């Protein structure tokens, strides 16, 4: 069995292929995309000592960004700045998101509600202007700073046309 041990700063150019496991202790940075059959995180369990917690990344045919939260209606309405509500600088949401959709759910009552997004402002309105229910909301926007992917292609993973479009 061959082994490669690297210490210190190392620069590699060109394609690097490895079979088997690779462990990186510390920070790794890519300027392109990471292509994998699945991607997961594995962290120390936040509640149970000695346990680990694993989750798989959400996968989709679009580069969607998901923002969510809760709000309480005042006089049947609530407005949320998606930037401020998610700790982002004003203008960030509009700069990186296109094809925006919102989803709303009334968590504490039966009053009908609807949501709309204009720029970074999510407006949630109830059917009645006296509603003070708590609403869960989710806004999804497709990244506009990268090209759309080609979902299906013919060939092997090395032929993937998306390897150059997501950088």
Describe the predicted segments one by one.
Residues 10-11, 26-167:
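Extracellular receptor-binding modules and their adjoining Ser/Thr/Gly/Asp/Asn-rich linkers
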Residues 1-32:
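Register-specific beta-strand positions within repetitive beta-rich fiber domains
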């Amino acid at each position: 069995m061959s082994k490669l041990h690297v210490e210190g700063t190392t620069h590699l150019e060109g394609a690097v292929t490895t079979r088997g496991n690779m462990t990186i202790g510390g920070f790794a940075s890519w300027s392109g995309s990471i292509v994998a059959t699945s991607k997961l995180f594995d962290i120390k369990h936040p509640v149970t000592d000695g346990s680990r917690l694993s989750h798989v990344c959400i996968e989709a045919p679009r580069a969607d960004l998901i923002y969510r939260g809760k709000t309480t209606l005042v006089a049947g309405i609530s407005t949320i700045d998606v930037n401020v509500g998610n700790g982002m600088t004003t203008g960030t949401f509009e700069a990186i998101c296109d094809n925006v959709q919102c989803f709303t759910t009334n968590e504490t009552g039966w009053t009908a509600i609807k949501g709309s997004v204009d720029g970074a402002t999510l407006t949630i309105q109830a059917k009645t202007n006296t509603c003070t229910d708590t609403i869960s909301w989710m806004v999804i926007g497709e990244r506009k700073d990268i090209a759309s992917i080609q979902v299906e292609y013919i060939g092997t993973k090395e032929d993937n046309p998306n390897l150059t479009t997501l950088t």
